[in-house]
């Protein structure tokens, strides 16, 4: 089984939409193939695998929880210092997410795809 997230499916609500879009674009640089799932079927077939099943899981939350705290911290560490994004920008973003959480407006979602495969 192969599991991977297509980072183009990520929805992360923030008050500053322009900043959020920039952060998400810069974060994609962290991944060798941020959109791998949409290209994986032909790659697997070309490598001699049979794809038995493909399924998806929506990872979604309407409140800040440990998984999202981890993603937020890792994202902030990666994007700070890239493309003009400062540590202060990241702190403002984190504060915005916290405010949205406090007011019940927080929303995060991303799709993970599962490929059940066998050789031959």
Model-predicted regions and their roles:
Residues 47-50, 70-74, 108-120:
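Core SAM-dependent methyltransferase catalytic element
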């Amino acid at each position: 089984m192969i599991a991977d997230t297509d980072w183009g499916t990520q929805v992360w609500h923030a008050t500053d939409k322009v900043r959020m879009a920039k952060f998400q674009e810069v974060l994609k640089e962290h991944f060798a193939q941020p959109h791998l799932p949409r290209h994986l079927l032909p790659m697997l077939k070309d490598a001699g695998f049979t794809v038995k099943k493909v399924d998806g899981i929506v990872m979604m939350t309407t409140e800040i929880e440990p998984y999202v705290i981890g993603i937020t911290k890792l994202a902030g560490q990666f994007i700070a210092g890239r493309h003009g994004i400062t540590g202060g920008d990241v702190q403002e973003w984190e504060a915005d997410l916290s405010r949205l959480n406090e007011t019940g407006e927080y929303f995060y979602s991303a799709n993970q795809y599962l490929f059940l495969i066998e050789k031959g």
